[in-house]
Structure formats: C-alpha cells, structure tokens
Amino acid sequence: MHGPHPTVKDIELSLAPEDVPVQCNVQLDEEDYTNVEEPAQQAYRVVTLCPKCSSPLRLVVECSHADIRALEQLLLGTLTVVCPRCV
C-alpha cells in the first residue's frame, strides 16, 4: 500500500505461507555421534609409602592426563593409600 489512504486494489487476500519441507524423522549417521574422541588412556605407576607402617606401595592406574592430575591432587590432600596389612 502506497499513499495516505489504503485502497481495495492494494489488499491481497490470497496470501498463504510457503510450503517448507520438514523432515521429522531425520537420523544421523552412526559415525556422527560415535566419533566422540575419548581422551588418550595411558598407564601410570604410582609409588608411595603406607602412612601406618612405611612399607612401599605400588599402584598402577590407566587414565587420561587430566585424571592423573586429579589423582595427584587427591594424594597431596587428604586421601591416603594404606597397605592391606594395616587395614
């Protein structure tokens, strides 16, 4: 509509929304969601002393670099590993 007053010829009554194809059952390829990259696992040997009898303890864990850092923080904090004889 142009001008100060609308006229009948400016009004369209046959407006309809465009047809848009909608696919509701779209499935992803298996590789799209199974290729989540896991952090690299590596074996780490932890050697410490039993806090009760001072005997050496050896612990082998397999984890990511971030997880071994978390274990290190736990061992430096309040977590203690004791030998089976001292339990």
Curated annotation (Swiss-Prot):
Keyword tags: Activator, DNA-binding, Early protein, G1/S host cell cycle checkpoint dysregulation by virus, Host cytoplasm, Host nucleus, Host-virus interaction, Inhibition of host innate immune response by virus, Inhibition of host interferon signaling pathway by virus, Interferon antiviral system evasion, Metal-binding, Modulation of host cell cycle by virus, Oncogene, Transcription, Transcription regulation, Viral immunoevasion, Zinc, Zinc-finger
GO molecular function list: DNA binding; DNA-binding transcription factor activity; protein domain specific binding; zinc ion binding
Main location: host cell
Chain residue ranges for the region called E7 terminal domain: 1-38
PTM summary: Highly phosphorylated.
Residue ranges covered by zinc fingers (unnamed): 50-86
Keyword 4Fe-4S: no
UniProt record, GO biological process: DNA-templated transcription; symbiont-mediated perturbation of host cell cycle G1/S transition checkpoint; symbiont-mediated suppression of host innate immune response; symbiont-mediated suppression of host type I interferon-mediated signaling pathway
Recorded GO CC terms: host cell cytoplasm; host cell nucleus
Presence of keyword Metal-binding: yes
Extent of motif Nuclear export signal: 68-76
Classification via InterPro entries: Papilloma_E7
Record localization: Host cytoplasm; Host nucleus
Entry-linked SUPFAM superfamilies: E7 C-terminal domain-like
Pfam family, one: E7
The protein's assembly and partners: Homodimer. Homooligomer. Interacts with host RB1; this interaction induces dissociation of RB1-E2F1 complex thereby disrupting RB1 activity. Interacts with host EP300; this interaction represses EP300 transcriptional activity. Interacts with protein E2; this interaction inhibits E7 oncogenic activity. Interacts with host TMEM173/STING; this interaction impairs the ability of TMEM173/STING to sense cytosolic DNA and promote the production of type I interferon (IFN-alpha and IFN-beta).
Free-text note on domains in this protein's UniProt record: The E7 terminal domain is an intrinsically disordered domain, whose flexibility and conformational transitions confer target adaptability to the oncoprotein. It allows adaptation to a variety of protein targets and exposes the PEST degradation sequence that regulates its turnover in the cell.
Family statement: Belongs to the papillomaviridae E7 protein family.
Function: Plays a role in viral genome replication by driving entry of quiescent cells into the cell cycle. Stimulation of progression from G1 to S phase allows the virus to efficiently use the cellular DNA replicating machinery to achieve viral genome replication. E7 protein has both transforming and trans-activating activities. Induces the disassembly of the E2F1 transcription factor from RB1, with subsequent transcriptional activation of E2F1-regulated S-phase genes. Interferes with host histone deacetylation mediated by HDAC1 and HDAC2, leading to transcription activation.
Protein name listed in UniProt: Protein E7
Organism encoding this protein: Human papillomavirus 28
